[in-house]
Amino acid sequence: VTVLLMSAISLSSASQHSHAILPPPSSLQSIGFGSCLEGQKSLSILSTITAAKPDVFIFAGDNVYAENETLDPKLASLREAYQQLSEAPEFQAMSESVPILATWDDHDYGLNDAGQDFPQRQASEQLFESFWGVPAADPSRTRPGIYRVVRIGQAPQAIQIILLDTRFFRTSLSKPWIPPLTGRYTPSEDPLQSMLGESQWLWLQEILKE
């Protein structure tokens, strides 16, 4: 069994999107992945990906950038970023022919460097899962966070793609007393510091035993 872990160091209903996300194929020979897709810039890279015809493509985080990252409880700017991507011809053509999986990082989570202290994290999760077509029956829909596993093929040639969530449960970063001299953050000595959170760690341990 091959294991691929993906992490990065959906609108109110799917029917509002002008795209559909294809499910993963039954077998794989090629996997594409990328991140940091700034919608304000050229999206021609998506046409290149479409032409390459990967069996599945993984958006690994920062898949959209809200124009105004704020604590807006309605996530208006983030919703608009998703809508713009949905309407982009390059993305529409890609999503029509290439199966897509996704995880997020801070900008498509909703706020730069945000973690578990982001007040809109649950609403952002709903946006993400709707936009990227996470199946209603997927176990990730029944728990906090977007982490999930996707299994493709049959043993002994099965592939297990593990999509981790490094934002929803991440504890706050340590900020220095004098940022200009030491940078935005400093190493933490807190033994409770976490990136995945306890529940995701326990889940990952069990998944890796399979």
Language model regions located:
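Bacterial N-terminal signal peptides
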Residues: V1-S10
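Intrinsically disordered, low-complexity serine/threonine-rich segments
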Residues: S10-Q16
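Metal-dependent phosphoester/phosphodiester hydrolase catalytic core
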Residues: H17-E210
